Swiss-Prot record:
A GO CC term attached to the entry: chromosome
Keyword Nucleotide-binding tagged: no
Keyword Lyase: no
Signal peptide interval: none
Mod. after translation: Acetylated. Acetylation at Lys-11 decreases DNA-binding affinity.
Residue positions where N6-acetyllysine is found in the record: 11
Cell location: Cytoplasm; Chromosome
One annotated GO molecular function: RNA binding
Protein purpose: Binds double-stranded DNA tightly but without sequence specificity. Involved in DNA compaction.
Gene that produces this protein: albA
Family the entry assigns: Belongs to the histone-like Alba family.
InterPro entries: Alba-like_dom_sf, DNA/RNA-bd_Alba, DNA/RNA-bd_Alba-like
Name the UniProt record assigns to this protein: DNA/RNA-binding protein Alba
GO biological process, one term: chromosome condensation
Amino acid sequence: MATEQTILVGKKPTTNYVIATVMAFNAGIKRVVLKARGAAISKAVSTAVMVRDRFLPGKVQIRDVKLLSDKVQGQGGRERTVAAVEIVLEMA
């Protein structure tokens, strides 16, 4: 069985990502990595805090946070730099 799962946070409601994270931990996954870019960064942070404080209090820790920048092709083929984040959650 896998010990790590990655969840890409995007345009869906925050509760969808919270439920996916909690289900992963309940399935025996020990580490979940939330990845987000641009406007979805705040949704990833909210997801991590909700899982840690409301859904699995005392069972999950925020182990690491990485701030990154990705280069993506924008409109007209121009290259843009977009902020990104990776939040690592682990069972305590």
